[in-house]
Curated annotation (Swiss-Prot):
This is Olfactory receptor 5H18. Potential odorant receptor. GO terms for cellular component: membrane; plasma membrane. Disulfide bonds join C97-C189. One of its GO terms (biological process) is G protein-coupled receptor signaling pathway. It is a multi-pass membrane protein. Residues 1-28, 78-93, 166-198, 261-271 are extracellular. Pfam families: 7tm_4. It comes from Mus musculus.
């Protein structure tokens, strides 16, 4: 498409993780294995929660939703990355690029809200155990989950709509392994300052809000644990919160660097490594973390395995 003497680009080239021919097949096999483990692990966790009536409580409904979001994030990025590792044609259209970014951003924002909601759930479970069934009902849980997914959808849609104001005319090379928003801004012919400001304000606000929710919730949880005199109660509290706290710690580190640190301070290599950790590594770790550190999940899994052995 042309506008005067300027050709507007509608197709882009993803540089991918590496252009070293000797590394592409080993990386393909590695990430294919990780992706299969991610999908099987997260969908298996969802199936386990769905099939066990004892796990039909808010805590595990949130966990099942987290497993779905992790599988979604990985599926939004990894299949295309695997294809590009073996393909000589690394082209992607602008519309496909926006769809991929929307899918990824929807999952990322939803997980952000979800981790904050899960922290509040842990706070109620530990600090107000007698009132937990009254406060955290399944009805409230479903309302919270609907709000979380709507929030993720609207935030992602907002950024995609603002992407439409940008034009691309100089370079069609995206130095990344998927269509992320910052690399697109870097090759835009239109001044992306407004878009960058919105990313900083909106993404930063969401992260600050959810991080504060997590910090306040776990500060109150810690005070409650310190008042406990029963060793069994302390162990149960740590069992309830430990997996979620570890998951939160792994999640927010790379995310802060990806979207809050100014783009001028990030290198392409650093950005890709942060994205790789967030889109590939965390989704495969979460079901392992929650399965190994949660007694009810492990007990339910053992029962299912014993029935089929």
């Amino acid at each position: 498409m042309e506008d005067g003497n300027t050709t507007l680009l509608t197709e882009f080239v993803l540089t991918g993780l590496t252009d070293h021919q000797g590394l592409q097949v080993p990386l393909f096999l590695l990430f294919l294995m990780i992706y299969l483990i991610t999908v099987v692990g997260n969908l298996g966790l969802i199936a386990l929660i769905w099939s066990d009536p004892h796990l039909h409580i808010p805590m595990y409904l949130f966990l099942g939703s987290l497993a779905f979001v992790d599988a979604w994030i990985s599926s939004a990025v990894t299949p295309n990355m695997l294809f590009d590792l073996l393909s000589k044609n690394k082209m992607i259209s602008l519309s496909e690029c926006m769809i991929q970014f929307f899918a990824f951003a929807f999952g990322g924002t939803t997980e952000c809200f979800l981790l904050g909601t899960m922290a509040y759930d842990r706070y109620v479970a530990i600090c107000k155990p007698l009132l937990y069934p009254v406060i955290m009902t399944n009805r409230l849980c479903i309302r919270l989950l609907v709000s979380v997914f709507i929030g993720g959808f609207l935030h992602s849609l907002f950024h995609v709509l603002f992407l439409l104001r940008l034009t691309f005319c100089n370079s069609n090379i995206i130095h990344h392994f998927y269509c992320d928003i910052i690399p697109l801004y870097n090759i835009s012919c239109t001044d992306p300052t407004l878009n960058l400001l919105l990313v900083f304000i909106l993404s930063g606000s969401i992260q600050v809000f959810t991080i504060m929710t997590v910090l306040v919730s776990y500060t109150l949880v810690l005070f409650t644990i310190l008042k406990m005199k029963s060793l069994q109660g302390i162990r149960k509290a740590f069992s309830t919160c430990g997996a979620h706290l570890l998951s939160v710690s792994l999640y927010y580190g790379p995310l802060l660097f990806m979207y809050v640190l100014p783009a001028s301070q990030q290198t392409d290599g650093q950005g890709m490594m942060d994205s790789l950790f967030y889109t590939v590594i965390i989704p495969v770790l979460n079901p392992i973390i929650y399965s190994l550190r949660n007694k009810q999940v492990t007990d339910s899994l053992k029962k299912r395995l014993e029935r089929h052995v």
